[in-house]
């Protein structure tokens, strides 16, 4: 089970596009939900004063959102459902932004109604769906599986709109629909539940042609239980629900097209149009006068007309786009507002407060209802500009005072920690990503802004549209090469270390929209080739070694959507937007075939090496673990603009078989349009970060001996007796250890091929070091070249982003002093990725969306007011005994700092695991907890929770216990129960971090008991029971446990780093039989500083 990834969004000055296609207000009247053409959902906070503020973006769809609806009884579970054009359906928890369920069906829904009859059906209810398919689908609201369907006995057709009628008079529920042909159909709901559950066919009981087309809305009047409002695009009608006889018809005037309507009171109708106007009508004389049908077939004449009382309109805007998406809400709670709301393609939301008794003017003319509130995403960014700065805003000085560089393309190189940004003016900026993030986020950023070396490459005369780092795709290519393309169809090959232009390719085509590389098995002249897709639908193939253009295919009539390779015959297969296929012979440059229709589909399906618009290939060479973001992106093969493009992660394609390894820190550039990058996401992999800081990675050790060390201890004793272990006197037993040396992970040797090139940067230059051979005993392993200082800096930045700065100023000072972490400049936009396809990001100004936080914690990095309550509960559950971690009371500052950081991250890792697990899994560890049983269940579904619990218990007391202590079990249950309370992962992590940091500082005697937030004063007497006991160290040897499959470092001096180095220069390694190294203390009688693995595996060898 994969843990969630923590994210920090570095927005630019411009908000991402959000073209609203669907809108609704939740039943609690606190949240507005909008779906967009770009595929994402936005949650907007709605206050009791009808003030709007954007709060969160939810990513889960890869196509335009078509409709939104309630998915549960909202008072019990705050769930909604969204549907997209490509058949995707997602169930969301709007409280925490989590996607609860997702499915893709071969149906395009245009309307969804939730139905649940508590006394007649079990489960969570049904989603009744209609759209571009016949009749009505019934989908299970929990699993999103198709249950059954309502069928038509005559004239089955697509359904335009529908509504559920709950009649209190006859105690029966009915489903009313109107087809595209204008036929009204009625199905019984209540009496059909058993038939549906038994998979029996259910047909309509009534039907009637309404003699109008393009039905937009059908609504039942709950006030009279007699009126039925049906809105068509050119007229709206009122029918008698008893016999469906026509009572009233109102035809559109001034060329307006109606878009919907609602019955807001008895005999009072609200109608709105596609251009954002609305009208309130009063049906005079009760409005119920039978229509006259002339015998000669002339136009229907009504005896009376409805009286127009009020109207609303939107502000005139030259850039105003249609159609508007509108809706109506009648609040059932105080203050009992009646609200008309609308969403625009421009992303604007507008609210009107409808009076309880609308009246016209004294002269009888309609009264204009003013706009109550209006808001856009850009308003959030303008109001909270400190939170909406991009990752390279501090480079604005490079532009000679002309403002911040406008980023149009971006690429992150994890192996170098380099962020490459192509700008609108043609320049390319290269900087250290982690340092750039620090300068953007932290208060001490002024100290960092001058330190990170940056480079500016100048060679383009137009905007840079695409970037490619070939070495990230194939390790056999030169590490210094980088490709960039611009609007003027110029592709430049750079040496990023020397800043030289190696070659320029002038394609004489349209803008270079994508740079791709051929797969590993497809080589021409012994080398892989580069594919350039241009805006004029042409494709060019470049040979980097020969610095030549091999092919320029120009005959495509439609935008290129797919590139495939045929390695046997050297064919390039191009798929276009019209589903046609072009087959090019690369050597001769001739067009071999052009196919369309079924033949084209067969050809595309026969090729394996595809480069698709929506593939699920990895985003970056070191982010295989970041699957949640990878699969959400539209992949690197984004060949030109899509009709409904979503936000896409920009990166290089990964089509090689190179060995990759995960990274604790990653930067993902995210596109908002095909021509520019809107913002960047910082991704923190907490699990990988803990793996690197703890010398024994959690996921790669034998579970039977990894935490309690029984088998390792026996092996160590046996090996000592045989005198096959290497002993080394510790020269630092009583001396201080640096934080970097303490956190230095066990590293894997570089094993790409037969050799590797190590390099480090000094003063903006590159030092090429000699190649070194690797022992033939070593098995090829993924390159795991990790800079220890970079890892500890990543950990500090991660803690800085999550700490609730400002809640307790004394605690802030102590964290800066004793943990050596910097304070945030202000609240940041946090995010999270919980599963493979969905993630969420907070928007600038999210901290002011909770009314309870505005007064007390304005400008505080507190995720929600709930964090303080959760922190109280966590502190109260902690054991009452107080213990100082071994060695912390007399350790040097750097060692104590590093110990504390690793301890905090380990705790947060545990919380991150538990909060996403069901309660029954977490409680299962309470009965019996022996390591043998874990070994037998290594491949079981509950392995993660058992592993984490053993880790938790070992960190707590360092003893081999057969079961989890009651106090620990209480903590496990508490954290697991938060899931059922709609607690977000970020809330849980921040609450635990606040409690742990505060308790840790108190246990060290650094702060008094009463120096804490007011909300935590009740639990001030609850001290933290420290994890690590004091052990006897009379004749102690430090045992360092490493992976069974990894080579081990020989005793060498600690890794030395340059100030600007990107990777540690690790020494040669040798394979040892037991893969363990024992170090003897220089002063056996004295306690000495031990690495964290000695605390995780407390082994004492006599």
UniProtKB/Swiss-Prot annotation:
<dbReference type="GO" id="GO:0005737">
    <property type="term" value="C:cytoplasm"/>
</dbReference>
<keyword id="KW-0986">Amelogenesis imperfecta</keyword>
<keyword id="KW-0677">Repeat</keyword>
<dbReference type="InterPro" id="IPR019775">
    <property type="entry name" value="WD40_repeat_CS"/>
</dbReference>
<keyword id="KW-0091">Biomineralization</keyword>
<dbReference type="InterPro" id="IPR015943">
    <property type="entry name" value="WD40/YVTN_repeat-like_dom_sf"/>
</dbReference>
<dbReference type="Pfam" id="PF00400">
    <property type="entry name" value="WD40"/>
</dbReference>
<protein>
    <recommendedName>
        <fullName>WD repeat-containing protein 72</fullName>
    </recommendedName>
</protein>
<dbReference type="InterPro" id="IPR049916">
    <property type="entry name" value="WDR7/72"/>
</dbReference>
<feature type="repeat" description="WD 6">
    <location>
        <begin position="459"/>
        <end position="504"/>
    </location>
</feature>
<dbReference type="InterPro" id="IPR001680">
    <property type="entry name" value="WD40_rpt"/>
</dbReference>
<comment type="function">
    <text>Plays a major role in formation of tooth enamel. Specifically required during the maturation phase of amelogenesis for normal formation of the enamel matrix and clearance of enamel proteins. May be involved in localization of the calcium transporter SLC24A4 to the ameloblast cell membrane.</text>
</comment>
<feature type="repeat" description="WD 4">
    <location>
        <begin position="318"/>
        <end position="362"/>
    </location>
</feature>
<feature type="repeat" description="WD 2">
    <location>
        <begin position="60"/>
        <end position="102"/>
    </location>
</feature>
<dbReference type="GO" id="GO:0072659">
    <property type="term" value="P:protein localization to plasma membrane"/>
</dbReference>
<dbReference type="GO" id="GO:0031410">
    <property type="term" value="C:cytoplasmic vesicle"/>
</dbReference>
<feature type="repeat" description="WD 5">
    <location>
        <begin position="402"/>
        <end position="441"/>
    </location>
</feature>
<feature type="repeat" description="WD 3">
    <location>
        <begin position="160"/>
        <end position="197"/>
    </location>
</feature>
<feature type="modified residue" description="Phosphoserine">
    <location>
        <position position="1083"/>
    </location>
</feature>
<dbReference type="InterPro" id="IPR036322">
    <property type="entry name" value="WD40_repeat_dom_sf"/>
</dbReference>
<keyword id="KW-0597">Phosphoprotein</keyword>
<dbReference type="Pfam" id="PF23123">
    <property type="entry name" value="WDR72_alpha-sol"/>
</dbReference>
<feature type="repeat" description="WD 7">
    <location>
        <begin position="507"/>
        <end position="552"/>
    </location>
</feature>
<feature type="repeat" description="WD 1">
    <location>
        <begin position="15"/>
        <end position="54"/>
    </location>
</feature>
<dbReference type="GO" id="GO:0031214">
    <property type="term" value="P:biomineral tissue development"/>
</dbReference>
<keyword id="KW-0853">WD repeat</keyword>
<feature type="repeat" description="WD 8">
    <location>
        <begin position="555"/>
        <end position="594"/>
    </location>
</feature>
<keyword id="KW-0968">Cytoplasmic vesicle</keyword>
<feature type="modified residue" description="Phosphoserine">
    <location>
        <position position="1081"/>
    </location>
</feature>
